[in-house]
């Protein structure tokens, strides 16, 4: 028997033995256990399904009335929201919104914010596809000063580039960003639009 034939035979026996070791008997699952597992799967998956539904409406489906634009492009609404605005649950009437989806599959994105008046509240709420609010940039967390924040997906392992204030990691490669800018009254709407 040649050396190659012997090696192939030994390898075949080893693979067969490993496969036999991994064989498991079927696990008996009661209907109650199956239902409990299904409930857990639903609770786990529902936020991602709803997040993707919003992603699709905002970035892909141009016929959808909630369409905002392509990935990585900010869409702002310097106006007062009413009960007719249903894309976001309970929109605020005193913090006009900007919304956008980031696609981090190819590379991180940089969010640069200008210096804000000290008395004006603003923030960027960053939400991953699991609907976890994983970071905020703005008055309550980073202050009202200017800054540049690198938003990176789960696979990015680079060093913080020069000029970047902070690196923010997301669990998912798609991130929903909601910006709120304080409106001091109807006469302030032009200033909010300028900020946005």
What are the functions of these language-model segments?
Residues 1-10:
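Bacterial N-terminal signal peptides that target proteins for export
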Residues 17-20:
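C-terminal motif of bacterial Sec signal peptides marking the signal peptidase cleavage site
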Residues 22-196:
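A compositional/structural signature for long, glycine/proline-rich flexible linkers
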């Amino acid at each position: 028997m040649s050396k190659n034939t012997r090696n192939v035979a030994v390898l075949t026996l080893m693979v067969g033995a490993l496969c036999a070791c991994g064989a498991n008997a079927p696990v008996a699952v009661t209907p109650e256990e199956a239902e409990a597992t299904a409930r857990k799967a639903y609770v786990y998956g529902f936020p991602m399904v709803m997040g993707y539904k919003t992603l699709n409406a905002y970035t892909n489906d141009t016929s959808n009335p909630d369409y905002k634009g392509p990935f990585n492009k900010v869409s702002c609404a310097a106006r007062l929201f009413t009960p007719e605005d249903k894309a976001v649950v309970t929109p605020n009437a005193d913090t006009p919104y900007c919304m956008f989806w980031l696609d981090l599959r190819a590379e991180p994105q940089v969010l640069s914010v200008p210096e804000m008046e000290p008395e004006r509240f603003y923030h960027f709420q960053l939400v991953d596809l699991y609907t976890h609010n994983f970071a905020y940039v703005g008055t309550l967390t980073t202050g009202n000063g200017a800054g540049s924040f690198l938003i990176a997906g789960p696979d990015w392992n680079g060093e913080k580039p020069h000029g970047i204030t902070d690196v923010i990691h997301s669990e998912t490669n798609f991130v929903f960003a909601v910006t709120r800018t304080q409106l001091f009254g109807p006469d302030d709407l032009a200033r909010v639009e300028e900020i946005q």
